[in-house]
């Protein structure tokens, strides 16, 4: 993609703070640094979002997450946890439409402005029958 910032980074047209690169992915520090070490793992191949991945692409890209995650853990002894996020579509807060995975280190006692919290549905919102119907609908799509 000609105007894709992540394609330009992957092609070496835009400099970045690269932490890892191979033939499939590039990983670099997010410019916003929600927390120290906030890293993006980006496929070099332009894939818009999770819905554009083949099984082979997904396997090749996502199997590299532990490598970067462990590097973050080893690099920052004060890291207490790690959020791994993949936003897909504008409604899900995807702002760069080239698939990427956020690895966001979390530190004890840090008020970093990052939050990930959702409220469970109110009791009774979904009956057992509703849940069975939802399950069947998804299963039908998986089974073809």
What are these regions (language model features)?
Residues 1-144:
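HIT superfamily nucleotide-processing domains
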């Amino acid at each position: 993609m000609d105007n894709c910032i992540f394609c330009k980074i992957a092609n070496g047209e835009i400099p970045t703070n690269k932490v890892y690169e191979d033939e499939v992915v590039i990983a670099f520090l997010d410019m916003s640094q929600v927390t120290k070490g906030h890293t993006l793992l980006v496929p070099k191949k332009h894939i818009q979002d999770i819905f554009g991945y083949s099984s082979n692409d997904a396997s090749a890209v996502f199997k590299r997450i532990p490598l970067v995650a462990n590097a973050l853990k080893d690099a920052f002894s004060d890291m207490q946890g790690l959020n791994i996020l993949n936003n897909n579509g504008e409604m899900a807060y995807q702002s760069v439409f080239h698939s990427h995975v956020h690895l966001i280190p979390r530190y004890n006692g840090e008020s970093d402005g990052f939050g990930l919290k959702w409220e469970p549905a109110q009791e009774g919102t979904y009956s057992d029958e509703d849940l069975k119907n939802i399950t069947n609908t998804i299963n039908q799509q998986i089974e073809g």
